[in-house]
Amino acid sequence: MQKMNIQLKEDQSSKHSFFLLMEEVTLTSVKQAVEWIFEANFSEEPPELMNLIITSPGGDLNAAFALIDTIRGSSIPVRTIGLGQVASAGLMIFIAGHKGHRLLTPNTSILSHQYSWGAFGKEHELFAQVKEFDLTTKRMIAHYKKCTGL
């Protein structure tokens, strides 16, 4: 990850594309970002680089993984730019940016925490939820390792 000032100059010949994800991570918010990536990848004149600017307190981890998989599958490099607060599921999306294309602005705060959830139901339902919790935790750890080299 690089931490630096961002200065964007207006350049009509620029082949860069920008998307602002400045809200909680939900299926609705990531749907727009997924559509943006798909449209660019199937465009007749695709951009050379896509810039996903993220300010998010976190949110739905499954929705985040939908966007993460889309970023990973993009044939166009996706630069992720952390702006303000990048927390929880928002951080998971941020680190999915292509290697060498992750930027944090100087005043960005990041937050990572242990996955947590609540459960209720009958005993067999609770056992199934515990299994799903363990699988999700393993996916998160694998994602951190892949993106950070830790």
Question: Where are the regions that the model predicts?
Answer:
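Terminal-region recognition feature
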Residues: 1-150
